[in-house]
């Protein structure tokens, strides 16, 4: 198994244990991007953003900023492919 695929599997396992943890979805999005699966990566970014919006806990400003940047990148990709 490829190293990146193994990392995705580990991310999947971590998310299965704590699905409401936005940073895990962010991490999986990064690895999926490296694997070239932009659509799944963007789905994970959207999930992470949604989790942050629903969170009653203080939000890490760096995590929030990183997700905003990734979300913009996803929107740009959708615009370029004509799906947005």
Describe each region flagged by the PLM:
Residues 1-84:
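Alpha-helical tetratricopeptide repeat
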